[in-house]
């Protein structure tokens, strides 16, 4: 485990490893993003500090390496910024600004690489936007109303086809969002109208849903986790019949607000972080019940 001390001058809101686990990007209320090189031991080196946001930076997301060394960030300033490293100079610069939202942009998430360079954003204006970065250098976006009081987070469904046809892949686009209306919603791309339509509404929380995570594994069934201010995490499963069933991760409420939830790459372990400054790990047993798999030690 690597501990990076005094990285920022204010609260750190996110820390994400790149695809290879060699670089760490962090972001903070100090309006900056920092990128560190990790060497697999306890050593790390600060590569660069990125400045460009005018407010706290809430989240960062690495693009798949097939698109280059690219990072997306979002901020209270209402912007999502796209940063790229030039391999020759190793200098980072802003290559795109996404400014369609009217309030804080709360999350950014790149689509599975099979779908192309596509970025998903949520905002306190209640809207979700999806931005396509096209091969010819142009961009196009779709923006739609999702959660009336504010959209807090969103993520992509895993791709379930090996098709290379771009039109067929676009039809595969499904996302799940969550918001301050206590709901999570599943959306499917509607090619005829070039928008996203609500496919399902996941009702079960009694307070704001702070985070949502769609498991990358969907071999047997689909799993979605939602983390809420009501101090619970719900696991939603979809079998072949298409209906979503909910289950409490644990019968006992968490000690504090559940801020984030995240699946392992294999999709069998869920990490939950909360207001008690702890990260707990959970795994489904053979009976379909979720049990503790320990905590991440600080």
Curated annotation (Swiss-Prot):
Keywords: Cytoplasmic vesicle, Endoplasmic reticulum, ER-Golgi transport, Membrane, mRNA transport, Nuclear pore complex, Nucleus, Protein transport, Repeat, Translocation, Transport, WD repeat. Disulfide bonds: none annotated. It is a peripheral membrane protein. It is found in: Cytoplasmic vesicle, COPII-coated vesicle membrane; Endoplasmic reticulum membrane; Nucleus, Nuclear pore complex. PROSITE patterns: WD_REPEATS_2, WD_REPEATS_REGION. One of its GO terms (biological process) is ERAD pathway. WD repeats lie at residues 7-46, 52-93, 100-141, 146-197, 204-246, 253-292. GO terms for molecular function: structural molecule activity. Pfam families: WD40. One of its GO terms (cellular component) is nuclear pore outer ring. Its main location: membrane. It comes from the Eukaryota. Belongs to the WD repeat SEC13 family. Has antigenic properties. Component of the coat protein complex II (COPII) which promotes the formation of transport vesicles from the endoplasmic reticulum (ER). The coat has two main functions, the physical deformation of the endoplasmic reticulum membrane into vesicles and the selection of cargo molecules. It also functions as a component of the nuclear pore complex (NPC). NPC components, collectively referred to as nucleoporins (NUPs), can play the role of both NPC structural components and of docking or interaction partners for transiently associated nuclear transport factors. PANTHER family: NUCLEAR PORE COMPLEX PROTEIN SEC13 / SEH1 FAMILY MEMBER, PROTEIN SEC13 HOMOLOG. The COPII coat is composed of at least 5 proteins: the SEC23/24 complex, the SEC13/31 complex, and the protein SAR1. Component of the nuclear pore complex (NPC). NPC constitutes the exclusive means of nucleocytoplasmic transport. NPCs allow the passive diffusion of ions and small molecules and the active, nuclear transport receptor-mediated bidirectional transport of macromolecules such as proteins, RNAs, ribonucleoparticles (RNPs), and ribosomal subunits across the nuclear envelope. Due to its 8-fold rotational symmetry, all subunits are present with 8 copies or multiples thereof. This is Protein transport protein SEC13. The lineage of its organism: Eukaryota, Fungi, Dikarya, Ascomycota, Saccharomycotina.
């Amino acid at each position: 485990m690597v501990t990076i001390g005094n990285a920022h001058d204010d609260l750190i809101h996110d820390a994400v490893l790149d695809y290879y686990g060699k670089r760490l990007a962090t972001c903070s209320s100090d309006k900056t993003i920092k990128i560190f090189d990790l060497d697999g031991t306890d050593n790390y080196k600060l590569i660069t500090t990125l400045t460009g946001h005018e407010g706290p930076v809430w989240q960062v997301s690495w693009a798949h390496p097939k698109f280059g060394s690219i990072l997306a960030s979002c901020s209270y300033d209402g912007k999502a910024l796209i940063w790229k490293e030039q391999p020759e100079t190793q200098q980072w610069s802003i290559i795109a600004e996404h400014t369609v939202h009217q309030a804080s942009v709360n999350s950014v998430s790149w689509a599975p690489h099979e779908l192309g360079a596509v970025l998903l954003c949520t905002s306190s204006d209640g809207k979700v936007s999806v931005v396509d970065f096209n091969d010819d250098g142009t961009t196009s976006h779709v923006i739609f109303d999702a959660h009336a009081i504010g959209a807090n987070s969103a993520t992509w469904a895993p791709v379930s086809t090996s098709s290379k046809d771009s039109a067929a892949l676009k039809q595969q686009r499904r996302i799940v969002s969550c918001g301050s209306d206590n709901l999570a919603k599943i959306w499917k791309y509607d090619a005829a109208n070039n928008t996203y339509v609500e496919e399902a509404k996941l009702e079960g929380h009694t307070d704001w849903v702070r985070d949502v995570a769609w498991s990358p594994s969907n071999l047997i069934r689909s799993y979605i986790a939602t983390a809420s201010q009501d101090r619970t995490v719900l696991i939603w499963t979809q079998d072949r019949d298409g209906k979503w069933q909910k289950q409490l991760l644990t019968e006992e409420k968490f000690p504090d607000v559940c801020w984030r939830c995240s699946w392992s790459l294999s999709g069998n372990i869920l990490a939950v972080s909360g207001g008690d400054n702890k990260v707990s790990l959970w795994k489904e047993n053979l009976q379909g019940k979720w049990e503790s798999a320990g905590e991440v030690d600080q």
